[in-house]
Structure formats: C-alpha cells, structure tokens
Amino acid sequence: TADGIPIVLHDVTLELTTNVESIFEGRQRDDGLFYAIDFTLAEIKRLTAHERTDLSGKAVFPDRYSGDGVHFEIPTLAEEIELVDALNAKTGKCAGLYIELKRPEFHESEGADLYASVLQVLREYDRLGDNPETVIQCFDPVTLKRVQSDGIFKGPRVQLILTETILGM
C-alpha cells in the first residue's frame, strides 16, 4: 500500500479483482490501471474484492462462487497470519503461509522495499526462523538472493520461473 502495509493480493493492480473503478474513479495511472501502491490501507479497505474479471468486467471464471452482495476485504499480511494462527489453534492443525513477493523490482522503482515490509510483519509474528510452515517465493532472482544472503528469513525460499523462460517462448 502507499503507507507500506503488505496486503494479500495476487496482482499489483486492483481493477481485475475489486470495485476500485467505482470507488476511486479517476485514480488510475496513465496506463489505465489502479496500482495498489497508490492507495493507503484505509482506502483499500473500502474496496470489495471479487472473483477475477477481464478488463471489460466479464467474469474470467463464471462458474465459481460470485460472492454477490458480500463485502470481502483485501486482507493485510498480518490479518492473514492471525487467521491462519487462529485456525491452527482451533483445529490443532499446522497450516502454513506461502508468501509471494510480487514484483519487488516494481515496488523498488516506486520507492518501496516490499521485502523489508514483509520481514517486519513476519518478525512481529515470530515467522523468521527455520520454519517450513512459512515459505517465501518470488519470480525475481535478485530478491531471492537478498533473502538468502541477508540471513534474516531462515525458512524455505522458492524461485518461481515463467513458462516462457523455461520453454523459450
């Protein structure tokens, strides 16, 4: 977010999975997209999350649960950790966290250190140790090398690779 709070969202933009266009009309960038980093957490909490749509607003997965009439918020990473911890306590299970650092190079170009923000939350919830239930994954190899070399996060790390990279497409 604009105020440096890590949120749980698949994309760095909001228009395909929220009602951002109807709430914050005119806040898109020149490319027509609404970037999460341009909104404070308070603003993002005003949005309703929904199933993915295409740019025309048509459901990408029309047979999935629509959530019509329900206000689903975009959670912060801290809220998600609290949810997982509460479920684990209630069920006696050990569900973990699989965190993707989404486009850290983009965030860096915007003056934000995504990795540092995520580390701060993980530190608050004692998730930095050698714990296989907390995983960090990323497409950016430079960021994953930083995760390894700084030695702060000791859990598993996963290098993501695009199909185009593997197949040379």
Language model features by range: what are they?
Residues 169:
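Glycoside hydrolase catalytic-domain groove-lining segments
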Residues 2:
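Short, ordered coil/turn segments that flank beta-strands lining enzyme active or ligand-binding pockets
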Residues 5, 10-166:
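Metal-dependent phosphodiesterase/phospholipase catalytic core, i.e.
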